[in-house]
Amino acid sequence: MVKKSENPKEWYNEIVRKANIIDDAYPVKGMPVYKPYGYKAFKFLMSLLENKLESIGAEPAWFPIVIPYSIFKKESEHIKGFEEEVFWIERAGNDKLEDPLILRPTSETEMYYMFAKWIESYRDLPLIIYMTNTVYRYETKSTKALIRGREVLWNETHSVHRSEEDAREHMAKAKEVYDYIFWDVLYLPYIWVRRPEWDKFPGGEETYAADAIMPDGRFLQVGTIHLLGQKFAIPFEIKFLDYHPFYKKYGDPNIYIKDKNGNEYKVHAPKEFWEELEKGKLTKTYTIKIGDKEYTISSIEEINEKLKEYDFRKYVWQTSYGISMRAFGGALYWLGDDLGLVMPYKIAPIQIVIIPILGKDDTKVIEYSKKVYELIKDKYRVYLDSDDTKTPGYKYYYYDLIGVPLRIDIGLKEVENNSITIVRRDNKKKYTISLNELEKIDQIFKEMEEDLKQKAKSFVNDMVVRVKTFDELKEAIEQNKIAKAPFCMRESCANQIKELLHAEVRGTDINPENAEKERCVYCGEPAKYWVYIGKTY
């Protein structure tokens, strides 16, 4: 097998096949078969994610795999972003379909068609739905197992809210969930970026992406969170009856109201009025101005009485976010070494393998190994490999290859000392503990976790370099580094960088770092923000 230290790309291509993660002998490009070991690990990952999503109010649902084109095309920006990637179903049996179907590339349109039917009033909000499924995109670039494919296993979540503020609060919760997955489960070296305008989700207002940095210095997008605003709510007519008729627009500081004929007016009121209104209770009398009319309002009930001529129905605010098999593949790529995979222990199908070292008294060793297995099998996913046709050396090689996090060696010495020898997969560190100290296994897992997190943190710090000139940028990219550079935020400059260096402007920090005192790394014009630039998958 190719060594990761010598050729990480080729190592990855080999290891996901040799370690029983996937088999791509299936004759459709970009659609591999997930073997039981690999699929179990992915399911454990999705289970952890689903539990976290439910902790922030999300509920599971299932939507059809096909979407009528008439529904899919309702949001114009969305269709422009995906139309070239979709798989079409134009016939059913011998009949040509009048309304062609597509295999879902993502589920916004099919979900929102139904959300419009489910939501009536503010009491129905928030609505938060997740679905672990497969999506299909006709990927024309070269495919790469788990990283770039045509059938994508993933989890997507969609949320619907009363206001922009509520939507943004939910995005912050979604980010916490994803940070748990990327950091506490997968130990990935990653950064959050806000995508530039030209690279945000089709049909969205803002896109925040988690970009992991792979061993070869390339970015791998492992998750995204989108503020959709009202861009889907309007074409899909997702409205709700609110307890007041005032509303905001994305990117506009003003507050508006509409009469029942659709005429729109700006509303002027004290800041305190808006603050109390959002809490659902007014504690004093306020004067508000709508167009050339003034109203005195002292309660929510008075809003309903005095503002009957206005429309209390509003468009919802929405978010969507997703994690795919890419995060799983990225973790395998990042954590592995020359010996094989290093499986993150929270998703490892086998967390601990017990290997009896047979010799003078095989019966004692086997019986003791079974005893150890019984003591720990209810707490961990444990496999006792008592196959006497294979040597311990072969077993060490195999379980290193598939990345089992901990190995327990049991020979006659361990039997006599009432102990076990534990070997960590990531760094080969050995521990000898008494059978009365099995709680120390938790400590070993925790120590392993902290070491892997520190490794990821150090890697990000080493990989990201600040540059100010194009020559410095070029040098950083040639050295497979990630550059942080001042940038004018023009798409034309980003395109030139991509053409010349085969690197992409990924975006700013979530809270953009101001670069107004600097010059754009490409064109030399005044810069706006510091951005991350690097090669990508």
Swiss-Prot record:
Keyword Glycoprotein: no
Tagged with keyword Translocase: no
One GO molecular-function entry: ATP binding
GO CC terms in record: aminoacyl-tRNA synthetase multienzyme complex; cytoplasm
One BP annotation, GO: prolyl-tRNA aminoacylation
Its EC number(s): 6.1.1.15
InterPro entries in the record: aa-tRNA-synt_IIb (IPR002314), aa-tRNA-synth_II (IPR006195), aa-tRNA-synth_II/BPL/LPL (IPR045864), Anticodon-bd (IPR004154), Anticodon-bd_dom_sf (IPR036621), Pro-tRNA-ligase_IIa (IPR002316), Pro-tRNA-ligase_IIa_arc-type (IPR004499), Pro-tRNA_ligase_II_C (IPR016061)
SMART domains linked: ProRS-C_1 (SM00946)
Gene3D superfamilies hit by this protein: Anticodon-binding domain, Bira Bifunctional Protein, Domain 2, C-terminal domain of ProRS
Cellular localization per UniProt: Cytoplasm
Primary enzyme class: ligase
Keywords annotated in UniProt: Aminoacyl-tRNA synthetase, ATP-binding, Cytoplasm, Ligase, Nucleotide-binding, Protein biosynthesis
Catalytic activity: tRNA(Pro) + L-proline + ATP = L-prolyl-tRNA(Pro) + AMP + diphosphate
Function summary: Catalyzes the attachment of proline to tRNA(Pro) in a two-step reaction: proline is first activated by ATP to form Pro-AMP and then transferred to the acceptor end of tRNA(Pro).
The protein's assembly and partners: Homodimer.
Entry similarity comment: Belongs to the class-II aminoacyl-tRNA synthetase family. ProS type 3 subfamily.
Listed PANTHER family: BIFUNCTIONAL GLUTAMATE_PROLINE--TRNA LIGASE, PROLYL-TRNA SYNTHETASE
Official protein name in the record: Proline--tRNA ligase
